[in-house]
Design a protein with these regions (language model features):
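Alpha-helical adaptor scaffolds
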Residues: 69, 102-164
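N-terminal leader/linker segments that initiate helical-solenoid repeat arrays
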Residues: 22-78
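Short active-site neighborhood of thiol/selenol oxidoreductases, capturing the structured segment around
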Residues: 246-264
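Generic helix N-cap/helix-start motif at coil->alpha-helix transitions
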Residues: 80, 93-99, 116-120, 131-142, ...
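Amphipathic alpha-helical scaffolding segments comprising HEAT/armadillo-like alpha-solenoid repeats
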Residues: 81, 114-124, 152-160, 188, ...
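Bacterial N-terminal signal peptides
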Residues: 1-17
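Specific register positions within alpha-helical solenoid repeats of the TPR/Sel1-like families, i.e.
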Residues: 47-48, 105-113, 143-148, 179-188, ...
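N-proximal helix/coil linker or "cap" segments that precede and/or mark the start of modular domains
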Residues: 185, 189-252
Length: 264
């Protein structure tokens, strides 16, 4: 069952496909596009009704009524996943399948269970069969996690295919990041592999407008430069519970038993 994961997923991963602007009705001439538009419109209506229902239940709860039932938070889009998947299969291997596959990948990835599995399968179809499509940059962060989704060997093969075959520079940049993220995360910062990985990623980023990915890369670099194993930790000064000043550097070379509490 999908509860708050659905709502959280929207914030974490960006707006789902069903919230994207739709093409004007007069532009949707072919049957595949018309079918897609009808499904998206139906999903929109279901989402709007769900939002109103949950809002009403929440208002009643705040006024002293019963708590919102757990199943009220279930995604209204779970039932649409199989329908979009079926439509994609009807156009398998053709460009007409791409919008359906992207909808499933973006909408189902924040879900759990069958929704997420369908999203992964759709993502795989997009980055393999349809890797030459120029519109895959809409998948954004998913393109940089090929190893996470499909394992080391297959994930690297898929990313390499995107880097070679995609006509979209942003997609190729995400693929470069996917291929090098392991080295950036785990290799020693003074190793040739780390240096080469960082150089390749920065070169790819310099040619495109992907500010969030660029910031993520530089944040990783900064964190590892300051906090890698063997580095000297930044000094910290403070006042203890007895009002005495102390600094972290005073304890260098000593064995310290730390007993602490925190309130976050």
């Amino acid at each position: 069952m999908i509860h708050l994961v659905f709502a959280a997923g929207i914030g974490l991963f960006g707006s789902p496909a069903f919230l994207s602007p739709q093409a004007p009705a007069e532009a949707a001439q072919d049957p595949a596009t018309q079918r897609y538009d009808r499904l998206v419109a139906e999903a929109n209506r279901a989402t709007a009704a769900w939002s109103e229902r949950v809002a009403a239940l929440r208002t009643a709860e705040l006024k002293g009524g019963d708590p919102v039932p757990a199943d009220a938070w279930d995604s209204p889009l779970e039932v649409f996943i199989p329908r979009f998947v079926a439509a994609a299969k009807d156009y398998a291997g053709k460009d007409a399948a791409i919008p359906y596959l992207k909808w499933v990948a973006k909408t189902g990835m924040p879900m759990l269970g069958a929704g997420r599995e369908a999203a992964k399968a759709s993502l795989k179809e997009l980055v393999t069969t349809h890797r030459a499509s120029s519109s895959l940059d809409e998948l954004e962060w998913m393109l940089g996690r090929m190893v996470y989704f499909f394992g080391e060997e297959e994930g690297r093969q898929i990313a390499a295919g995107l880097r070679t075959d995609s006509p979209n520079a942003k997609v190729r940049t995400w693929a470069v990041f996917s291929l090098n993220s392991g080295a950036l995360e785990s290799d020693p910062v003074d190793s040739p592999r780390y240096t080469a990985a960082l150089k390749e990623v920065r070169a790819a980023l310099a040619a495109v407008d992907l500010p969030m990915l660029a910031a993520e890369v530089e944040n990783r670099v900064a964190v590892r430069a300051k906090f890698s194993v063997g580095m000297v930790a930044p000094d910290i000064a403070g006042v203890d519970l007895q009002g005495e000043k102390f600094a972290l550097s005073e304890y260098r070379g000593k064995v310290v038993l730390v007993d602490f509490w925190g309130d976050w």
